[in-house]
């Protein structure tokens, strides 16, 4: 049996809050330290779980900071700081990692899916010479603008899904946000746009009303007067993306014996699986289990590859 902690991070996302508004102004490094402090406090109050193997996990942007959080925890363990968290490893899914990989492989991925033509792909290779992050000439900039325009026509999070309304309310102003910190009311401020039932975002739409329901909040133990309205994505949070790459943290952790599970959906163009495979190869690990199919119920379910440090 496994126990799972679902954490709203960074502070001021989800149902988390800060007594001082400055506490919401964080970035990759500071938010990761916040998570470490939370875990230290949680294990201090629940010492019966300290002996359990502990794994961190996160998808998408959370996948970028998970190795950093794991590094902070491992450093605390090496210094024998209490509580001693029994960290064994981490898992990340479709993780944002490094723009040199994540952005560059969008072009190759779009070509593989047939979203851009051979001619556009060849023009991109010729004029950008493999650098699709910051165009170095006008011809490269123009072809990348064409690529981005074509990708914008689809749901790049899953290229087989229809493009739907993103079920997130419009950003609220600072005055309204401050008012939320003082109110006990859970009356929704502004419902998100309603997608059609066949859209994958319809679940996000329903979640907005479910999470703002009083029975749900009571069941979750949400403290009254803290967060008046739950919003799935708070785009207006003052978050600084100050860690350029998480690759050094992946390398450091795995070389020190921590286990890592990196998984990636093959229809994601926001973080293409090609980019994930590329940065993993850059770690120069030896392959211990060749690329193969694994089966579930007699059907090929996926094609995993296992690696280990040299």
Language-model features, listed with the residues they occupy:
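Terminal and linker regions of secretory-pathway proteins
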Residues: 1-310
